[in-house]
Design a protein with these regions (language model features):
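Charge-dense, helix-prone N-terminal extensions
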Residues: 1-116
């Protein structure tokens, strides 16, 4: 995976965040990949060209993985953390946009920093 691959995949995320008007969303990096932060807290980051890490409450994570396992999943690394993995090729922009807003709200209101 090249920097260009990551940048291209993350452009979709940035466009959806901008379209939703999510104030104070700032581009950064997290673990060497593109991320977006609010109040200096990561709410989404690119894991690879086809997967993002999206912050969310544990209860929501469990529900999302039960309802749409083809879209939402976790690896051993994320078990017990307020983050869910999202397959970008399996999610429509409308749903992804809503999840991004949820993540933005979660981190804007939550002072706890999670492993992203």
């Amino acid at each position: 995976m090249t920097e260009a691959d990551l940048a291209s995949a993350f452009a979709r995320i940035e466009a959806l965040v901008q379209a939703r008007g999510l104030a104070d969303a700032v581009r950064g990096t997290s673990y060497g990949t593109p991320s977006l932060k609010v109040k200096d807290r990561t709410f989404v980051r690119q894991l690879d060209a086809s997967t993002i890490v999206l912050q969310c409450p544990l209860e929501q994570k469990v529900l999302l993985m039960e309802i749409s396992p083809g879209i939402y999943f976790e690896t051993d690394h994320y078990v017990g953390y307020d983050a869910v993995l999202v397959r970008l090729d399996a999610i429509e922009d409308e749903e992804l946009s809503l999840r991004l807003e949820d993540a933005w709200r979660f981190k804007a209101q939550n002072g706890k920093e999670d492993r992203a």
